[in-house]
Structures are given as C-alpha cells and as structure tokens.
Amino acid sequence: MSAAVLAILDSDLKAAQPALHKARQVADSTKAPLHVLVNAYSSAMVRAVGVDHERQDAARAQIHKAWQNRISELTDRERCQLSILWHKDSMAALRESILDLQPAMVVVHTSEESGLRRHLFTPRDWQLIRKAPCPVLCVHDRQWPSSPRILAALDPGTEEQPENALALNVLRAADHFASNLSGGLRAAHVLDEMDDSLILLVGEAIPDYSVGMDKVRQFYRDRFQAFATDHGLGPDQITVLTGPVAPTLAKYCEELDMDVLVVGTVHRNLPERLLLGATAESVITRASTDVLVIKPDGFQSPWQA
C-alpha cells in the first residue's frame, strides 16, 4: 500500500476542517490512502471533571464518540483511517504519530495566530514546516476551484551550482500536483535585490555597479528561462519577479489568484537552520494562497536526530 495523505484536524469539534477536505482531494487524485488525525485532549474537560478516574474515562469516551460522529459527517469513514489521540502535549503527539505513520504528505489548516504571537509561540504549521520529514501542505479556508492554479517558486541555481536539486523537486511536485488535480501550472523565480536607497549608495561608490547589476539580472533571467525550457515549461508559463522573496511571491499569488504555491525549504548548516521554511512561513502570513512545502534531498528532521 502507498503512503497515506495525513489530514491533521483543528481541535475545535465544530470547525469546518479545510485540511480534511483538501487532504481528501489530494488522496483521491493520487489514489493514496487517507488518514485522519485529531488530538481530542481538552484541558477544560480535565479541569471540570477533576481527578475522578471513572468520570475522566466516561468524559473521554463521550468526546471520542463525538469526534467519530463529526468525522463521519465530513468524510466516508470506510475510506479513511482514523486516529483520535488524547495527549496534553499536542506537538509531541503529532511528532510521534507522523514518525510512526510515515505519510506521503501532511495537510494542516494554517494557524490563525497574529504576527506577534507567531514570534512568541511556534504554531503548529511552523513546527511541521521545519521538522516534519515529508511534504507539508498548509491550507486556508478557501476551497479550490475545479482547476486549481499552481505556482512553483524556483531557484534554478548559480554559476557555481548550475543544477539545483531542490528546484527540480519543487517543479516535479508542482507538476504532479497540477496534473493530479487537473490544474494549471506556472513557475516563478524571484530576483531578491537591494532596495533603491542601497543601490544609489553603492552606485555612487562603484560607478559601474548599475551596469554590472543589469548583467547579473540578465544572467539569472537567462538561467531561469533555460531551466524552464529544459524541463518542459513554455514561455507563457514562467515569470521572473524582482523584490524581497516572500512579499513578492505573496503579492504575485494574490494578483493572479493562485490556489497553491509550491516552495522548497532552505536547510543549511547549523547557524542557518532558523531560515528553514522562512519563505513559506512569510508567505503564509501574507497571502490566502495555500502553500505546499517540499523538503530538500537528504533532509534530516530534528525529530529523527
């Protein structure tokens, strides 16, 4: 049997559960099993019931049954496996379950936390982006149309490393995603340049700087176009953008009403590990586009260290 698509549900029993709906679409389109997971632990119930073990067991059984009924309302129980957990530490429960299940993909409803709270506490989707050993699809409430619009964010390489393996993985994942869901595929490369004030300062110090930057821009445009052509993308499917990566991608996704952005994580040496998933996380906070995060070859999950 192929690896399952794992839908992680929101803990609110009455929530719409967009992660479940989209995980089911992905599973159906790839003929993969669907596994539904929810941590039903309720601290409010624990406080209300107190230390009486019989009352705790009875309350847990009622909550378990309520979740079974709710999931039956949302999907065909016979077509999916169901894990209803009871764990005070929700991230520890997710970690253990994901490592045990080894899913092909994790689908999660992206956090609604405010920007400040995201810096104070690490929400569930950020943890999964950084640490899950498989692709992670972070979804918003908006439903996909019958033909979803898929954008692959690509960095095709540098002069020193002309073939970027992660870019290939991202493009393949985006292509498969679009094909399986009968969607349309586009690809974009973002040239992350200095802001205008810095360019003016550098231009005054180095007279030929602007000419040199034009050559650099053209070099990366040509490299991206060659990469796209080599991998079957037509001129009408590719776009070169300029600006800070995350806000530029988010703005482009909004302007073209993209449904899913496919990005790769950055997993470098120890001092740079905080950068892992930074682009994906920033886009999630800026746009309503769903984000599929692809891990690089040889990715070492901190959960498996």
Q: What name fits each language-model region?
A:
Residues 1, 15, 54-55, 72-108, ...:
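Structural beta-alpha unit
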Residues 123-144:
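Short, structured interface segments
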Residues 53-65, 207-219:
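A short acidic, glycine-rich active-site loop
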Residues 108-127, 260-286:
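Glycine-rich, Arg-bearing micro-motifs that act as flexible, cationic patches
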Residues 1-54, 149-207, 296-301:
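Small/aliphatic-rich secondary-structure junction motif
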Residues 35-37, 81-85, 137, 186-188, ...:
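General small-molecule cofactor/ligand-binding pocket signal
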